[in-house]
Amino acid sequence: MRIIGGTLRGLRLNPPKNLPVRPTTDLAKEALFNILLNQIEFEGIKVLDLFSGTGNISLEFASRGAAEVISVDRSIHCVNYLKDTSRQHKLDQVKVYKEDVFKYLQMETEQYDLVFADPPYDLNKIPEIPKIVFERNILLPGALLIVEHQSMQNISQHPAFVEQRKYGHSSFSFFRNQADEQA
């Protein structure tokens, strides 16, 4: 696992083997960020990373110039690893919270340019993520929600669904806040 772009490009991440995670593969992450390069400007954006695990995605956004990256995971071991890694590489824009993601979303009052969610594949509440994010008005106008999930799972029922990209057994489903971007 490595950072593929930005100021920390090439940095190898070596999380402890006992973390309860399934990190996004380098191949899938590189494909995701290539898609995003054509859609958003990373410099200065505000990102919410749900089920952040090792922080692989959070650190990638921070490396590429995100102004603020909020990472949420319920594992104290993942939270501690990401806090330590962020501190070690002076990524002050990464803020890490130990919390159940669904509880966090119910309390969240901020809005983001991008929300990324990589829940455990066996989580039966994955289809609820877009519903909650949009009900809570967590995305800025024009902003994206990206949910990583098993390719065999379909979560395209939400009206804000834009597209799904498959990478082997993993897929990214994209949702866009279609609210007036001029507001």
Tell where the protein language model's regions lie, with residue ranges.
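Class I S-adenosyl-L-methionine-dependent methyltransferase catalytic core
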Residues: 1-183
